[in-house]
Structure formats: C-alpha cells, structure tokens
C-alpha cells in the first residue's frame, strides 16, 4: 500500500535535493518503485520481471498536482519536454443519468459548474476531503480528470498539500491518492507553500537552500510558515482570513452598494474578484442582471470589490505580524531574524490580485516597523504545482 503523508502542524523536512533523499528523514519517499507483489506462479514472476525491465527503459513522467479547494492544477512536461503543460480546472463534479442507457455519467470542472449549477459539488471546501463520502466523490473527480487528460500511469507524482492539522482529512486525501492511476514510479507530498515558493526564487530549486517566510493566501485558509533549507518551521493556519470570505464579503457589499436591488451568488462574486480586483488601478465596472417578470437592470460597482480586498489584506497582515511572527520568534529566534532579512514569499490565489505584493510589503513593514521585501511567482495560483513538478523531476533524476 502506498504510504501517503500530508503536512500537519508538525515540522516537515525534505532531504537535500542534490542527493538521494534520506528515507529515514521526517519527510520521506511515499511510494517505492512501481513493482508487483510476489507470486508463486513462475509465469507471473516472469511477466513481472519483463514489466520491470520495460519500465527501467522508460523514463517516469514527472507530475506536480495541487488538489485545491477551488481549483485543481496539474503540471507535466509539454510535448517537447521543454516547458510545462498545465491542466487547470474547478475542483467540482456533477453526475447525471444518460438519457439512453440510464448509466451514471460524470462531468467535472467548469463544464459541471456551468451546466449543472443546481447539483454541482465542490469537493474540498475545507481544503481536504471532510469524510469518506466526500473522499469517494473526490476520487471520482480525480480519476475522471486523469482519464480524460490521459495522464501517464508510470509517473513520479508530487502533491502540494495544505498545512492543515486535520489527521482525518489527511487520511481521506490519502485514500484519494491511493485510488488514482498515476504515480506508478513514486508518490510524495510536500507543503503547498514550499512548492509555491520554488518558482518565486528562480528557475530551479533555489528555494530549498534558502531560509525564508512563506504566506499562502488560499481560498479556505491563510497559512504561514518559515522554511530552513526545506524544513518547515512553526506552521500557522487560520480559517478566519480566506479568499472564500472575500467572495462572501463582495456579495454582501454588492447588495449594500446597490441598495438591495442586486443580489449575486458567491460564484459571481469570485468572478468579480478575479476579473476586476486591482490594488494598483481598480476601475469601476458595470454588469446587467435580468429582473423577475422581464426586463434587465444595469448597475455599476465602485466599492464592493476593493473594500472586501482591502479588509482581507489588513486582516492577513495582522495575522502574520501579530500571531505568526511572535510564535516563530518565540520558538526559533535565529530563524526569525534571518528570515526577515530575506524575501517573504506570497503564494495562493489571492496573491494573483495585481498590486497585492507591494501593498502587503508596505503594510507588513509598517506593522513591524522595519523594511521587508515581499515577492511572488509570476503565476502564484500555478506556482505550487510547478514547484511540485520540479521536485518530481529532481527525484526522478536522483533515482
């Protein structure tokens, strides 16, 4: 059985990636080489040896995966092997009955959300599968995604996992990973914020040799951790400051700004945020809704989106400056001092908002009364998956 371990509130350490990983370290390889069970049948043994020999000649495909609460992202080599092929979809599914055969059919991602809004299910609203039923649905979603995108079974897969102290949820995620048809060579998991920091530091794995702070601005949690040469220290998580809460605030703000004439759902609010939020140059925008009984109503949004984003950023800075950093200083004073002299990395979907990096830098510096530098990858929402794929590439090379 595959031994899949997620990140919890305990410290995680990955081996030095320039060397073969230490399998006794606290963060270890999660699956051994893709072999078969022993059998007394000589024919089966011969087939297994032939299989293994064939696999030795075939290079395992490195794959990075992030099963996110809003979106799932997969990164693998493109057809030329020179860049990344990115598969990005909403982490949701809907089932329906085939009109001809009566069989159950599955739609996932944007297609499910748009065609079956009344029955679509987002599977990881808390960041992990909440129970066995949700894990089974998540497994169905993931297997459908794998099949439709023809992801290779003989692959080395690294999962970017959120830092959540939820053993039951980690076990449910383990069942999803174990049930998938990829990862025949190896499967491993690393903290999402570490994976997301890798593209921010350069084109290789420079982040693994750094001491730095990472803040993951996700849909369901705000996470912060220190990293010392790949070792995760003082992981902090709160569900009080989230991208999902921003969506709810935008929906409420729109109702208030339009004096109750317009009500939008959270999906529409998220689209407003992703399309229009901008700390550098926000511009008011108009939208149109159909009114009951016929006719339409055009309205303009001036404050609703950015008021919610401003509140989010203030709360995120407060959590980092007044909760996470004091805890880090108390437990690891030297790392605290060294890390603040190095860049703070923002990851996660909220880090995609234009101008948020500079605003976070200014507000965190003011809160700490010192200069800080804040950076992010070019595409913060894709960065954890790209970083995970780079780790997978190194692990394959080291084997």
Which residues make up each language-model segment?
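Short, aromatic/basic amphipathic alpha-helical patches
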Residues: 170-180, 357-365
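Conserved phosphate-binding catalytic cores of ATP/NTP-utilizing and phosphoryl-transfer enzymes
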Residues: 33-58, 187-215, 385-393
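Phosphate-binding glycine-rich/basic clefts of nucleotide- and phosphate-handling proteins
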Residues: 95-96, 102-104, 228-318, 322-329, ...
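Haloarchaeal acidic low-complexity proteome signature biased toward cell-envelope/secretome components but also
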Residues: 1-58
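Gly/Thr-rich phosphate-binding beta-strand-loop-beta motif of the actin/hexokinase/Hsp70
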Residues: 55-83, 205-232
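Conserved phosphate-binding loops in N-terminal lobes of ATP-dependent enzymes
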Residues: 16, 22, 56-61, 67-169, ...
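Helical "lid/coupling" subdomains associated with nucleotide-phosphate turnover
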Residues: 128-137, 188, 195, 199, ...
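Small-residue (GG/TT-enriched) beta-loop-alpha framework at ligand/catalytic clefts
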Residues: 179-263
